[in-house]
Each structure stands twice: as structure tokens, then as C-alpha cells.
Amino acid sequence: MVRGYHGTAGYYVQSLTGGSGAAWNADARFPAASTLKLAIATTVLAEHSGIPPPGSRVDSLLRELIIPSDDAAANALLVWLDGSTSSGAYRVNDLMRSIGLSDSLMYGGYQVTRALSIPIPRRVDDAPAFGVGKYTTASDMTSLWRALWLASGGIGPLRASRPGLTAADARYLLWLTAHVRDQPKLDTFVGRDRKVDVLHKAGWISAARHDTGLVFWEGGVFVAGVMTYRSFGVSTSSDRLAGRVAATALQRFRRIEG
């Protein structure tokens, strides 16, 4: 399925309740685009004292960052973290390294324009060639989602490395991701199932299109990350690929876990 994509692709899926999963090209670095906004939000909540009050500046910026994926909000939150976008990016990188995300880099701000049991093989099968800038992998982004899910229960690597990120903070961020306004990607097919909820954060630029998130179903929850790159431009075929990966994973986990 992924090997048939006309471009470079990678994916990682794992049941967080059963532990089984699969991966392809999961350690290949892709231009990160907006996927790292999830890491920005996580870092802000780890530093902020308590959940931002509704309507406060930080609450408003976080909502703009996650729900419509606003670049100006991302830059404002990086400045909030440490006085500038570059210094704020350093803080985000520090958080990612603290939980073992070694193949992701937050490189400055965004250009604002108007308009669990059995190890899953993680390797580089086909890495895209691109210039300097933000990058991440399907493996790293799914690890961040897994860490947030664990943190929502008060456990896991984020709680250990960032005690300021409370279970309530993590649940607040997950709630925001449940309200993302975006063209269907991971939720292309599984989103039609009324017993399924998808919490996700996508990212896209002209040459790259990704989606990563959590899929909750009546029998459990799984994490999924699908990344695509094509030097001459990506299209909605990337969204359909993400949708097929999520649908296949859900079908498999339902069969295995009941």
C-alpha cells in the first residue's frame, strides 16, 4: 500500500492497548511542516502554570495553533516560551530530546502567509532529499502522541521529564486536537464510523503532506503517523493513503483485540 505511493512515504501504527503494530520507512526524515505544532503546544503547557484560562491569550493562541493550524499563533507561542522564535524553538527541541525524539528538529518559526509490547521495526527505507529546515519522522511523531496519551493518565516519559505538564494539561491538548478543522486524512474512512474518534494534527507544504494522531475505537486506541513527500508536489492522494493506513490498522486491531 505505502510502497505503491508515487513519491516517498513512511508510516507507523501501533495499538496502545494491545501493543501490536507495523511500520515502513518510519525513521526517514521528512519536512515537518505543521506536525511539530503539537510539540510547541506540549512545551507551552509544560511551562504554563495550569490549564490556560478560557479566553486568555495563551488559550486563544493554543486554539489557533491546533484547530486551524495558524502559523502566526505558532510564532507567538515560540516567542512566549523564550523571547524569540529561535529561542522558543530551542525549548521545543529540548522537550523532544528529553523523551527520546532524536530525529525531529524545530528550526525557528513559521513563515506567515495569508490565505508497546513487541518492538515494531523502525528503519529508513527511502529517505527524501530536501533542504535545511524543520524535520521529523513517523516514528518520532507517533512517540510524541503516545507520550501525550500516557501523560493524560499522569504517567509516561513526558510526566517524568516535564512535571509541569499535568494530566489535565495533556487532556486539554488532546481535546483541542479532537476539534481540528482540516480536510480528512487519517479520518478519511474511519471517520465515517460513529464508534470511532480521531484526534490528529496534520502538516503540509507544497512537497510534503502528513497526518499523525490517535484513533479511539470501542476496543481501545491506536497511534498512527503517515508521511509523504514528492519533490514536484503532493496532492490529496497523500490524504487517501493516510486514510487507508488508518482503516487497515483499525480492521486489524479489531480482529486481534476484539
Show which residues each predicted segment covers:
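Penicillin-recognizing serine hydrolase domain
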Residues: 1-9, 14-18, 78-258
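Active-site-proximal loop and beta-strand segments within enzyme catalytic domains
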Residues: 45-72, 86, 98
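A generic alpha-helix surface/boundary motif
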Residues: 38-42, 71-72, 90
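Active-site SXXK
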Residues: 19, 29-53, 65, 224
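Glycine/charged-rich beta-loop-alpha catalytic/anionic-binding loops adjacent to active sites
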Residues: 18-28, 58, 122-126
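A glycine-rich, coil/turn loop motif that links secondary-structure elements
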Residues: 26-31, 66, 130-135
